[in-house]
């Protein structure tokens, strides 16, 4: 006999916990199913020294501050995970851990869905997929197995001691790739960093964090991504107290920058001749935000210290002006490649008709093309801020309101009019 509830929420990370708060506050019966522990990916699928990319005053839910992190500091991955555990306890979230959802199907000839799990089946009127975009590590099959002793995705990287002696190539210049490359260099490794197109906002400018600037400039609320920018790599770091990602500074410290990793043949990697362009475009995005911030300060008469030095960029290093286009891995002593090339969503368990030909959810603000199915925690779900901790909280409120409204219509048949 199947258990019954109104809503099954799949996943108890930031999206699932936020969803539970809004459903609970409106009295909607629901269950949150989590195959491991609350916020598991923060605990076991990130490197040891990871901290949040936004300050604690910003990267949180409205209802609870971090108890053990100063507002302008950056929470460690353990502190972030414990924050969500504490939040779930605070709101009394009905989370069941250690329960894996194996399939969700629409029930034949009647409303609602059958949710099959590792601990039996549940019938629900609504299902919220709150598993997020980081399900499946992805990296291009460029370098064959065995070409170097170790190839791993950034989700498997923990610390420098984990890798064999020798040089390391890090592929990907988003927050993960940059922080891992910097940590490896500081541990004494020779490091090559493959840099693609990216955005590198200032960590702080004129005394305020970039999260604040994006807020007052209205950029978190941008509703549709700029053309081609849906998956822009953002290079930002809260490591060591937080600092602006500066590829020139990395190069000056000994990291050798190369372009996009293009191909491999006979022990030699080839890189695209795009490094200077990628650096220049990232610089222009950085400078554009500074100019927008200056205009905002002037227009609103704010008393914030000027910071003209932030506009001054160091000369391009030799690795940019005369880029290396080939790397003989053995000759350079490269024994490890870390692919910081992102993730893909995995909705293999969600067997309903709401995906396009590329397997992407067909949805608007989390409301899917399949009535009763919702998505939460995806980039650009409603706005730029959607994949961030505070952004997903607001998206969850919208989804909960939609569920409550739909419940009202469904209740029409069972009430006196």
Could you tell me what each predicted segment is?
Residues 39-65, 250:
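Redox-cofactor-proximal catalytic regions of oxidoreductases
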Residues 67-71:
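A short acidic, helix-capping loop that chelates divalent metal ions and anchors anionic groups
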């Amino acid at each position: 006999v199947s258990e019954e509830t109104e809503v099954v929420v799949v996943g108890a990370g930031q999206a699932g916990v936020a969803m539970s708060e809004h459903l609970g506050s409106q009295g909607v019966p629901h269950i949150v199913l989590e195959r491991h522990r609350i916020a598991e990916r923060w605990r076991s699928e990130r490197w040891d020294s990871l901290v949040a990319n936004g300050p604690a005053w910003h990267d949180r839910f409205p209802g609870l501050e971090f108890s053990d992190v100063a507002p302008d500091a950056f929470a460690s991955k353990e502190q972030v995970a414990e924050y969500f555990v504490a939040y779930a306890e605070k709101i009394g979230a009905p989370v069941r851990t250690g329960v894996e959802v194996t399939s969700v199907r629409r029930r034949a000839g009647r409303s609602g869905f059958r949710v099959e799990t590792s601990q039996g089946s549940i019938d629900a009127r609504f299902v919220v997929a709150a598993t997020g975009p980081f399900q499946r590590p992805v990296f291009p099959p460029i370098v064959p197995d065995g070409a170097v002793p170790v190839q791993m995705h950034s989700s498997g990287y923990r610390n420098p001691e984990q890798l064999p002696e020798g040089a390391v190539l890090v592929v990907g210049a988003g927050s993960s790739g940059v922080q891992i490359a910097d940590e490896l260099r500081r541990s004494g490794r020779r490091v090559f960093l493959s840099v693609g197109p990216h955005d590198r906002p200032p960590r702080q400018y004129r005394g305020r964090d970039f999260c604040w600037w994006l807020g007052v400039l209205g950029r978190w609320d941008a509703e549709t991504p700029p053309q081609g920018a849906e998956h822009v790599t953002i290079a930002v770091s809260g490591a060591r107290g937080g600092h602006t990602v500066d590829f020139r500074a990395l190069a000056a410290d000994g990291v050798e920058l190369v372009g996009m990793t293009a191909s491999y043949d006979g022990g030699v990697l080839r890189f695209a001749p795009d490094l200077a362009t990628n650096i220049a475009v990232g610089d222009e995005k950085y400078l554009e935000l500074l100019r927008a911030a200056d205009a905002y300060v002037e227009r609103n008469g704010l008393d914030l210290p000027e910071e003209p030095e932030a506009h001054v960029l160091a000369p391009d290093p030799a690795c940019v002006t005369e880029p290396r286009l080939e790397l003989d891995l053995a000759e350079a002593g490269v024994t490890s490649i870390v692919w910081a090339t992102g993730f893909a969503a995995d909705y293999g368990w969600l067997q309903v008709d709401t995906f396009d030909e590329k397997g992407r959810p067909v949805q608007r603000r989390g409301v899917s093309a399949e009535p009763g199915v919702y998505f939460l925690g995806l980039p650009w779900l409603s706005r730029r801020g959607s994949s961030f901790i505070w952004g997903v909280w607001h998206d969850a409120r919208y989804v909960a309101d939609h569920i409550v409204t739909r419940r009202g219509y469904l209740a029409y048949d069972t009430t006196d009019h």
